[in-house]
């Protein structure tokens, strides 16, 4: 059994779409940076799936691959950021300047998602070393939450790449569902501990994984909202104040 079943293609360290050696118009360069960001996001998403699967398979080769890909993601983070800094020095239309500003934030969020995949692999190593296992229900719960997180991540990346706000409300709804799912799973895991149905160590790792997945969803939401050049938490706070004043 595995927790995620999407294809896990190979990845390469070298950037595919951006290069300071090839001259292109600034607007084309911005589009290429977006394509490189999409590639980096696919790497991070695939690596998260790979890492989650190692919780079940304990496959050391796959765990090693998670760490290798994380290095690639960090490499791309630096390369794209440097490229954007270089682009920012050109004379650009306001729309491109805003797009570059948003890309800085998006690339950082993707890098943070990559960090969570590495944390999951660390948990798989800990579970292997300490002979810790989850119940079948625990595995199912993680798999279902992972599916929700992948959905919001896919939609957010697509939204940003297309610069399309059409599905923003759907992103907000999925994010709210994931927040509720995290609360429900944390409560269920406390109940399992109380009934002695799982060990304290398994419970602690499970709790960390659920919290980590919720934070991945937060980063995905940030990516969607970056189109507006607005932080989702700041927006929620502003709307709450506006609602209270009505």
Give the location of each predicted region.
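Cytosolic, long alpha-helical scaffolding segments
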Residues: 5-246
């Amino acid at each position: 059994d595995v927790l995620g079943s999407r294809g896990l293609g190979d990845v390469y360290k070298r950037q595919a779409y951006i290069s300071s050696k090839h001259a292109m118009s600034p607007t084309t360069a911005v589009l290429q940076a977006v394509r490189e960001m999409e590639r980096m996001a696919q790497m991070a998403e695939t690596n998260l799936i790979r890492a989650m699967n190692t919780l079940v398979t304990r496959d050391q080769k796959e765990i090693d691959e998670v760490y290798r890909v994380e290095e690639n993601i960090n490499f791309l983070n630096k390369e794209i950021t440097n490229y954007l800094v270089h682009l920012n020095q050109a004379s650009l239309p306001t729309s491109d300047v805003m797009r570059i500003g948003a890309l800085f934030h998006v690339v950082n969020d993707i890098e943070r998602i990559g960090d969570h995949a590495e944390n999951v692999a660390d948990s798989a190593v800990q579970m292997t070393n300490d002979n810790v296992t989850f119940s079948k229900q625990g595995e199912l719960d993680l798999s279902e939450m992972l599916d929700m997180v992948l959905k919001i991540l896919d939609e957010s990346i697509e939204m940003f790449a297309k610069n399309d706000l059409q599905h923003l409300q759907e992103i907000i709804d999925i994010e709210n569902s994931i927040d509720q799912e995290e609360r429900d799973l944390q409560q269920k895991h406390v109940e399992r501990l109380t009934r002695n149905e799982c060990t304290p160590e398994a419970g602690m790792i499970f709790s960390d994984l659920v919290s980590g997945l919720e934070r991945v969803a937060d980063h995905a939401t940030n990516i969607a909202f970056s189109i507006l050049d607005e932080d989702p938490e700041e927006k929620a706070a502003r709307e709450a104040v506006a609602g209270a004043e009505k």
